[in-house]
Amino acid sequence: MSFRSSIAAVVLGAAVFVSPLVASASAAPAGWVAAWATALQPIPDLAAPPPLYRAPDVAGRAVRQIVYPTVSGRAARIRISNAYSRAPLVVEAASLARAGEGAALAGAAVPVRFGGKASVTLAPGQELESDPVAIDVAAGRPYAISLQMGANQRMTVWHRVSNQFNYVSAPGDHVSDPGAALFRTRFTQYAWVSELAVEAGSARANVAAIGDSITDGLRSSVNRNRRWPDALARRLTASGAESIGVANLGISGNRLLSDSACYGTSMASRFERDALSRAGVKAAIVLIGINDINFAAMPPRAGLDCDHPHTQVTAASLIDGYRRLIEAAHRHGVKVFGATLTPAGLPAGREATRLEVNRWIRSGGGFDGVADFDAVLRDPARPSVLQRRYDSGDGIHPSDAGYTAMADAVPVEQLQAAVGGK
């Protein structure tokens, strides 16, 4: 099989295992809301992957992942996923606790059970929510989700860019260990855990922020929660909307219309699973399309060609993709806000496509609201590039200050109205 054919097999095979198992958020019990979430993607299945795509050894070890909920609650549950895998996922035990410094715990580890059992095995493609856990969850504080992995478990699915240090223990059962000494392996991905939901009362709601690396927070400060969805969550809290959680469902490199072996399935394919299935979701903010415009012009690469397929797009094809997202959201009773594509210093032809897409987004175009990220980030003298103070240094991804400016551009009052108030 050629490499290009193998890439297609990875992506298309993954889709077979995922799509039948998506559940609607409307089926979630009342009063539960996603306080934290991430979008998972397959790890390229290669004999000798590049360093960026090498997963740590997790067999018979505890994996401890640090998450920051955006809304408080009096009980919690986690969702684990075996999406994109061709083998079962075996979790021998799980726990949830307040996190301390590094991999250390600041509170007692509370066991997490699945159907009353400590261990669980998920079939390929299966997602599963845990039983509720009696634990007070405080928004903005770190929590550690620890999974004790099966003796032969391999990591086949992750969220590649976490901007958060997570940890793998030495071999053995360390799922409830309070100290950090045995968690010597550090990695900057999330694996298997796709959501932490809290029981927060009937008036609570979630906003799903979904996009590419700019939503993912690429090049923001590690362990500092400086992505724009983080800043939006803080802004909502400061405005008195403590009842609204924000889930970051960005995937670096993601495209609206094309799958990638490195950058996940297209948003057109993953939108319902990653955004519309979130507990308590009432609104989504969509920022996607710049990679569709840009990757088409990238030359094919030998080996792992993350930009494959190099599909040419037009403003019309992107707009058609947005309309499909809007229709899906409205079928689920979810309001959807469109975000304008941010400056990336593109050549004239690609820049013209970006500007045409932005004109459509600003005109309404079927979206329930607009977050004009382009307007706040662009250089007034050269609107095709980022303002220097908002540029992380690569001309594409914002700095911490740029991500904050993006959050400030979200129409919060309109967003609150869309989700049903504070």
Language-model segment annotations:
Residues M1-V11:
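Bacterial N-terminal signal peptides that target proteins for export
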Residues S2-F3, S24-I210, S220-N223, A241, ...:
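N-terminal secretory targeting modules
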Residues A9-P20:
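Bacterial N-terminal signal peptides
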Residues W36, D57-Q65, P88, E92-A97, ...:
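Conserved SGNH/GDSL esterase-like catalytic core that processes O-acyl groups on lipids
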Residues A208, A247, F337, G369-A371:
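Hydrophobic/aromatic beta-strand patches that form the interior of the parallel beta-sheet core
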Residues T215, A233, T237-A241, L276-G280, ...:
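Sec-exported extracytoplasmic/periplasmic mature domains
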Residues N254, G264, N294-A296, A302-L304, ...:
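Catalytic His-Asp segment of secreted/periplasmic serine-dependent ester chemistry enzymes
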Residues L287-D292, Y322-E356:
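Active-site segments of SGNH/GDSL-like serine hydrolases
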